[in-house]
C-alpha cells in the first residue's frame, strides 16, 4: 500500500522548517500559517512604501464595515504601524446605512475591533446625515436602483466622517478582486474616462481628502485566509439589497477567468493601469456643488439630486438623465435653495460601487484549493 504523503514543506524565504498549510492565491507559494501572515503583511507594507501612501503624523480614517476586507485592513494597518513605526494616528470610521438585520449586526463586529485594536471609533448614519435610511429608500423606490443611492451616500458619508474626526487621509478595504471587477465594469460601460483612473491606488487628491487602497494587490482569497489564520472576527452575511447589483455580474466573470488563468486578476489591474486616454476624450472638470459644497463635475452633486428626488417624489433624479434633472440644476444655478440638501463639507461624491465584503458559499469553495 502506498504511503500517504504529508503536507509539503513551507516555502518561506525565511528558512522555515514547518509544514505548509496554505497556498497563497496571489503567487501559489505554499506556506505555513505564520509565514503566510508575514508574507501578506509584507505585501501590504511594500505597497504602502512603494506608493508613499502616508506621511508621519497623519490622522488616517479606516473605513470599517465589519466585513472581512475592512477588518483585515484595520488589523494589518495597526500591526504595520506598530512594527514599522509609521507614526500614524489610526481611527475607525463606520457608516450606518439603516439596514435592519444587516448593518446593525455588522456594527457589532466593528465595536469588537475597536476594543481589540484599541482604536477610536466614529459612527455616522444615513438617517442623521440625509434624513433617510436605506430601508426607507428601498420602501419608496424598490430594489432596482438602491445600490446607486447607497453608493453615492456612503462615499459622501465617509468623507464627512473623515473630516469630522480631522483625518487627512481615508483608507478603504478595496482588494485586487474589487479593482479587477471595476476595470471590467468600466470596459463594459464604455466609460473610458473612469477606466483611466479606476485603478489609481490614491484617489481624490484634487480635493481635501485623498483616499488610499493599501489592499489593492491583495487577493480576496488571501484576505479570507489571513483573517482565519489570525482568528479575526468579521461579519460575513451578504447585504439583503445587494444580489441584483451590477457588480455581481462582473464578479462572476472575473472568477470564471481566474479558474482558467490564475493571474487574470492582476492582468486586469495592470491593463487598467496602462490605459492612456486620448486628448479628444473629455475628462470631467471637478468643481463644488452649488447646494452643499461637495466636489462634483456638475452644478449639483449626485447626492443632492438623489435627496431632492426622494423628498419631492421624483426618484429618477440623479439616477437617469432627464429634463427634471436639468430643471433642478438650473434652479440651483439661479440661486434657488431648498431644504433637503446633502449638507456642507468637503470631499467628493459619486457612486463608488461599494465593495462586497461577504464570504458566501462560492468563496468558501474557492478557499478549499488553498488549504492542505
Swiss-Prot record:
Residue ranges with Basic and acidic residues bias: 361-372
Keyword rRNA processing part of the UniProt annotation: no
Region described as Disordered: 335-372
Keywords, in A-Z order: Cytoplasm, RNA-binding, Transferase, tRNA processing, tRNA-binding
GO BP, one annotated term: oocyte development
Location, primary (coarse class): cytoplasm
MF-aspect GO terms: nucleotidyltransferase activity; sulfurtransferase activity; tRNA binding
Pathway(s) annotated for this protein in UniProt: tRNA modification; 5-methoxycarbonylmethyl-2-thiouridine-tRNA biosynthesis
Enzyme class, spelled out: transferase
GO cellular component, one term: cytosolic tRNA wobble base thiouridylase complex
PANTHER family documented for this protein: ATPASES OF THE PP SUPERFAMILY-RELATED, CYTOPLASMIC TRNA 2-THIOLATION PROTEIN 1
Record-linked NCBIfam families: TIGR00269 family protein
Protein name: Cytoplasmic tRNA 2-thiolation protein 1
Amino acid at each position: 500500500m502506498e504511503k500517504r504523503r504529508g503536507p509539503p514543506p513551507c516555502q518561506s524565504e525565511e528558512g522555515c522548517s514547518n509544514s505548509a498549510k496554505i497556498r497563497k492565491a496571489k503567487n501559489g507559494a505554499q506556506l505555513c500559517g505564520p509565514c503566510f501572515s508575514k508574507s501578506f503583511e509584507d505585501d501590504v507594507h511594500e505597497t504602502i512604501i512603494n506608493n508613499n501612501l502616508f506621511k508621519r503624523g497623519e490622522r488616517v480614517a479606516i473605513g470599517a464595515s465589519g466585513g472581512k476586507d475592512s477588518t483585515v485592513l484595520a488589523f494589518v494597518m495597526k500591526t504595520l504601524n506598530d512594527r514599522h513605526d509609521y507614526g500614524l494616528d489610526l481611527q475607525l470610521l463606520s457608516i450606518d446605512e439603516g439596514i435592519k438585520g444587516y448593518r446593525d449586526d455588522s456594527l457589532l463586529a466593528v465595536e469588537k475591533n475597536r476594543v481589540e485594536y484599541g482604536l477610536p471609533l466614529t459612527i455616522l448614519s444615513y438617517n442623521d446625515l440625509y434624513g433617510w435610511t436605506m430601508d426607507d429608500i428601498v420602501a419608496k423606490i424598490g430594489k432596482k436602483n438602491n445600490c446607486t443611492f447607497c453608493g453615492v451616500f456612503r462615499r459622501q458619508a465617509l468623507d464627512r466622517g473623515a473630516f469630522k474626526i480631522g483625518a487627512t487621509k481615508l483608507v478603504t478595504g478595496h482588494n485586487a478582486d474589487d479593482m479587477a471587477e471595476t476595470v471590467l465594469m468600466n470596459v463594459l460601460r464604455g466609460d473610458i474616462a473612469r477606466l483611466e483612473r479606476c485603478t489609481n491606488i490614491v484617489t481624490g487628491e484634487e480635493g481635501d481628502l485623498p483616499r488610499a487602497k493599501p489592499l489593492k494587490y491583495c487577493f480576496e482569497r488571501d484576505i479570507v485566509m489571513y483573517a482565519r489564520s489570525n482568528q479575526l472576527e468579521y461579519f460575513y452575511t451578504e447585504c439583503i439589497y445587494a444580489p441584483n447589483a451590477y457588480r455581481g455580474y462582473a464578479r462572476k466573470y472575473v472568477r470564471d477567468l481566474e479558474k482558467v488563468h490564475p493571474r487574470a486578476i492582476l492582468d486586469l489591474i495592470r491593463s487598467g493601469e496602462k490605459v492612456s486616454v486620448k486628448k479628444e476624450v473629455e475628462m470631467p472638470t471637478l468643481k463644488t456643488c452649488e447646494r452643499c459644497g461637495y466636489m462634483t463635475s456638475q452644478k449639483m452633486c449626485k447626492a443632492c439630486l438623489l435627496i431632492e428626488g426622494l423628498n419631492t417624489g421624483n426618484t429618477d433624479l440623479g439616477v437617469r438623465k432627464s429634463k427634471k434633472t436639468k430643471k433642478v440644476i438650473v434652479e440651483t444655478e439661479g440661486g434657488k435653495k431648498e431644504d433637503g440638501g446633502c449638507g456642507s463639507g468637503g470631499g467628493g461624491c459619486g457612486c463608488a460601487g461599494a465593495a462586497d465584503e461577504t464570504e458566501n458559499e462560492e468563496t468558501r469553495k474557492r478557499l478549499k484549493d488553498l488549504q492542505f
